[in-house]
C-alpha cells in the first residue's frame, strides 16, 4: 500500500528497542541448550558457531558449510569476531576444503560481519560473495538461483519480511531449508514488515521442507510444525487486536467529539488485551510489535486510523462495506 495514502509513513512504525529487552532476553539465554562450536549436523552440513552468544543472538550466529567434497558453500559469516574466523580457517585448512560460494541470508551485521576477514584470509573470495541487494563488489542472488557443489544443490528462496533482502536456501538433497532469521531454533523472530513476513512464512511452508537449519539456535527437526506455530502465533495476535477494535465499534463506545466515530489508542488496545501495564513497557516493548500488527491490518483493509502521533492516534475496525474504500476516520 502507498504510504502516503495511509495518513502516515514507515516513520510511524516504532523501532524495536533492543536495550529494553536485554535483561529479559539474558534470562532466556540461560535456558538455551548448549551447542558445540563446530558440529556435523548432517552428512553434508557442518555448523560453525559465530562466537557471539547473547540476548539477541541466542547461542550465537550459525554459519554453515554445505557439501561433501573439497568444494563447499558457506552460508553466512557471523559477526566478524576473531574467534569465528579462527574456527572456520582452521577447519577449512585441516579438512582441505575450499569455498566456491559465500551466500548471505541478509544484510544484518551478525550475518555479514565476517566477510572482510574471509577476504583478508583469501583474496580470491572477493568475487564469490552473494547477497540479495548486494553491497559494492558482491554478486546478486535471484529467487530460484541454484548453487551446486559435490553433495549439495542449494536453491535461493526470496523471503523478505524480517529484512527487505532476506533469503532462505533450500538444500535439495536433504529437503532442508536454511531459514536465516525468519524462523529461529528457539522462540520467535522479529519482522521489519509484518505483511511480507507472513507471506514469506507461508511461502516457506509451501516448500514442504522437513528440516530447518536456522541462523540462530538448534536444528529444527520438524520444520512444518515450527512454521505453523509461527504463523498461528502471529495470526492469533492479529485476531486479538481486531477483536478488541471490533467490540469497540459494535458497542458504540468509540463515539468522540462531534459524533465522529473513532476507535482506541494503542494504550487503550493494550488495556483491553493485557490489562494495565507500565507506560515504559507499552512504549518500549509492546508498541513496536503491536503497531506492526495494526499496520498490517490497515494494509489488509480491516482497520483504519485517525492520523496523528503513532502512540496517540485512534485505530478502529472498518465495517465490511467500508473495507474497500480509502482508509480514514469514518464520519
Curated annotation (Swiss-Prot):
Binding site for Zn(2+) 1: 106, 108
GO BP, sorted A to Z: antibiotic catabolic process; secondary metabolite biosynthetic process
Alphabetized UniProt keyword annotations: Hydrolase, Metal-binding, Zinc
Top-rank taxon: Eukaryota
Cofactor: Zn(2+)
Keyword Hydrolase: yes
One Pfam family it belongs to: Lactamase_B
Enzyme class: hydrolase
Cofactor binding annotation: Binds 2 Zn(2+) ions per subunit.
Keyword tRNA processing listed: no
E.C. number(s) listed in UniProt: 3.1.-.-
Binding sites annotated in the UniProt record for Zn(2+) 2: 110-111
Active site per UniProt: 110
GO MF annotation list: beta-lactamase activity; zinc ion binding
Known pathway: Secondary metabolite biosynthesis
Family recorded in the similarity comment: Belongs to the metallo-beta-lactamase superfamily.
Known role: Lactamase-like protein; part of the gene cluster that mediates the biosynthesis of neosartoricin B, a prenylated anthracenone that probably exhibits T-cell antiproliferative activity, suggestive of a physiological role as an immunosuppressive agent. The non-reducing polyketide synthase nscA probably synthesizes and cyclizes the decaketide backbone. The hydrolase nscB then mediates the product release through hydrolysis followed by spontaneous decarboxylation. The prenyltransferase nscD catalyzes the addition of the dimethylallyl group to the aromatic C5.
Name of the protein described by the UniProt record: Lactamase-like protein nscB
Organism: Trichophyton equinum (strain ATCC MYA-4606 / CBS 127.97)
